[in-house]
Every structure is written in C-alpha cells, then in structure tokens.
Amino acid sequence: KGKGVGTKRATGTARVITARDGVERTFHQGDILVTTATDSSFMPYIRKAAAIVVGPLDQNVNSHAEVAGMALDIPVIVCNAKVVDFIPAHSLITVDAEKGFVYKGIPKEE
C-alpha cells in the first residue's frame, strides 16, 4: 500500500532495479519499474514502463517518479517501504494507482 499517483491500473512483469548495469537489455516495453528512487537517468525505462513502484520515499514530497508518471500518464505508487525487498523480480504484478495498491498477479474484480 502506498500513495497512488493517477487513476490508472497496469499489469506487467516487475523489473526490480537496484543497479542499472545491464538494465537496457532486460527492461521491455510494458514492464513495471520497481526501484528505490528515480532520476533523469531512468527516463529510457520510465518511457517503456506500464507503471512505476518506488520507495521508500517521503509521500508528502513530489518525487521524480511521480512527476514523470504524471507527465507520461502512467500509474505510480510511492511507498514508505523499501519496495525492492518486497516485490519479487520477474513476478506478474498489478498496480492500481487509484487505490494505492500493488497486487500479486491479476486481482479478481470486485
């Protein structure tokens, strides 16, 4: 659970990035970017991403990930927790920015 930015939902493969070595070969269009923080060097991956999950960050301050997500109209979840420790790499996840949730797999519709 975190602060959602936007109202969209996206499902894709979690690409957990802790170091950018070799990322350009493994990050694909529609993947979900999972990392501790972003900056302008992440833009090639953010442009391909279906969504962004980032943390731990202060939820009261607009982060680079939030601004980039709003500009590109992709869902973003900002968490207090270190998301790279909780979201398994290469797992199928769904990001629901309206609710501020990240789900394992595809959630059943309510």
Regions found by a protein language model. Give the residues of each.
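C-terminal amphipathic alpha-helical interaction region
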Residues: 1-2, 74
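Acidic, glycine-rich flexible loop/linker segments
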Residues: 8-31, 36-110
